[in-house]
Structure formats: C-alpha cells, structure tokens
Amino acid sequence: MIGRLHGKIIEKQPPEMVIDVQGVGYEVLLPMTSFYSLPQIGEEATIFTHLVVREDAHLLFGFAQKQDRTLFRELIKTNGVGPKLALAILSAMSVSQFANAVEHEELAKLTKIPGIGRKTAERLLVELKGKFKGVAQSDFFEEHSVETIVATHSHDPADEARDALVALGYKLADAEKMIKKVNKAGATSEQLIREALKASL
C-alpha cells in the first residue's frame, strides 16, 4: 500500500496530477478540495494516498490532509459508493461540511452531488450517522487553510474546469451550464471549479 508521496509536481490537470518521486511519475486523482491547496508545477508537495486495485487498473487517490483520506475510506465502505463517487463527494464539500450534512440529515444537500440519488444518500446517513459526534472538537475534522490558488498551464480555464467537472461525474451539459454561470475574465480553472461546486450546493 502506498500511503504517502512526497515529490515535485510535474503536471496538473484537474482532478488529476502527476508527482515525480525520485524519477518515478505517479498519476494521482484528487478531490477538488485537495487540488485547491496544491503548490505550483515544479514545486514540491506531500500528499496522503489510497491505492485502489482493480482487475483492469491500479488507481492512486491523493489527499492534502489525512482526515480527507480517512473520510474517503469510510465512504468506500458504504454499499453503492465506489472510489469515483467518494471523490465527487469530497470535491463537493469539505470533511466538516459532509459531517454536518450527515449529522443533521440534510438529504437534499447530498443528492445535489452527481451520482448520489435518494437511496444512496439515505444509505450514507444510516451507515455514517453517529461517526461524526463532536466534530468541532476533533482534530480529525480540523479545518486547514488552503494556499493561494495558482493557475495551471491551460489554454482555456473554462474548458479545463468543464472537463474536470465531467471527470467528477457531472453530465457535459450540466458542467457547461455550471461553468458559464461563474465564468469571469482572469479566473483560473481551479477558481471556476471551486465557484461552480459551491454554487451547486
């Protein structure tokens, strides 16, 4: 199991990055909440990882904080929630936001995330409720400030942001509408993704 990587970021294409660790480039999928805190291409970063082994692929998921990875692992234990859906959940809301949604049984908030229907949302509430007691006092859910968002090398931030939303499970037409609503001159793809996800909840 690969639990942690430290190296130089050589590619960033939301929601994927490539990190060079002593000459080996690891492709890593990250939730957008972690992607926002990545430093610039060429700089060093440390990410916590979870390896998913399938018949057709080995997928490496990365997280800026340990508590993000812990929630990811709890999510994929839930019946009907695979790694890609867990990634979409963590892209749409922070760990503490998700914990609050579960503890307060905010079904509507959960069903706004692509791939989560009413049944899956109800299952999440049943299986995870009670696991987040005292989240405000817990270091596990401590909010961490994120570094300033930096531009990825892209020709069109709006197209890149749209593609990232599609990769997270949104339909192309919905992704285009979401980006169109928040698009503004000078915005980076990461800023557009963040604003689009925030507006969708």
UniProtKB/Swiss-Prot annotation:
InterPro entries according to UniProt: DNA_helicase_Holl-junc_RuvA_I (IPR013849), Hlx-hairpin-Hlx_DNA-bd_motif (IPR003583), NA-bd_OB-fold (IPR012340), RuvA (IPR000085), RuvA_2-like (IPR010994), RuvA_C (IPR011114), RuvA_C_sf (IPR036267)
Disulfide bonds: none
Key words of the record: Cytoplasm, DNA damage, DNA recombination, DNA repair, DNA-binding
Family as reported in the entry's similarity comment: Belongs to the RuvA family.
Region (Domain II): 65-143
Record's subcellular location: Cytoplasm
GO MF entries: ATP binding; four-way junction DNA binding; four-way junction helicase activity
Protein name according to UniProt: Holliday junction branch migration complex subunit RuvA
HAMAP family named in the record: DNA_HJ_migration_RuvA
Major location (coarse): cytoplasm
Positions of region (Domain III): 154-201
UniProt region (Domain I), positions on chain: 1-64
Main function: The RuvA-RuvB-RuvC complex processes Holliday junction (HJ) DNA during genetic recombination and DNA repair, while the RuvA-RuvB complex plays an important role in the rescue of blocked DNA replication forks via replication fork reversal (RFR). RuvA specifically binds to HJ cruciform DNA, conferring on it an open structure. The RuvB hexamer acts as an ATP-dependent pump, pulling dsDNA into and through the RuvAB complex. HJ branch migration allows RuvC to scan DNA until it finds its consensus sequence, where it cleaves and resolves the cruciform DNA.
Free-text comment about domains: Has three domains with a flexible linker between the domains II and III and assumes an 'L' shape. Domain III is highly mobile and contacts RuvB.
SMART domains listed in its UniProt record: HhH1
Keyword DNA-binding set for record: yes
Flexible linker: annotated segments: 144-154
GO BP term, example: DNA recombination
Keyword Endoplasmic reticulum: no
Quaternary structure, from the entry: Homotetramer. Forms an RuvA(8)-RuvB(12)-Holliday junction (HJ) complex. HJ DNA is sandwiched between 2 RuvA tetramers; dsDNA enters through RuvA and exits via RuvB. An RuvB hexamer assembles on each DNA strand where it exits the tetramer. Each RuvB hexamer is contacted by two RuvA subunits (via domain III) on 2 adjacent RuvB subunits; this complex drives branch migration. In the full resolvosome a probable DNA-RuvA(4)-RuvB(12)-RuvC(2) complex forms which resolves the HJ.
GO annotations of cellular component type: cytoplasm; Holliday junction helicase complex; Holliday junction resolvase complex
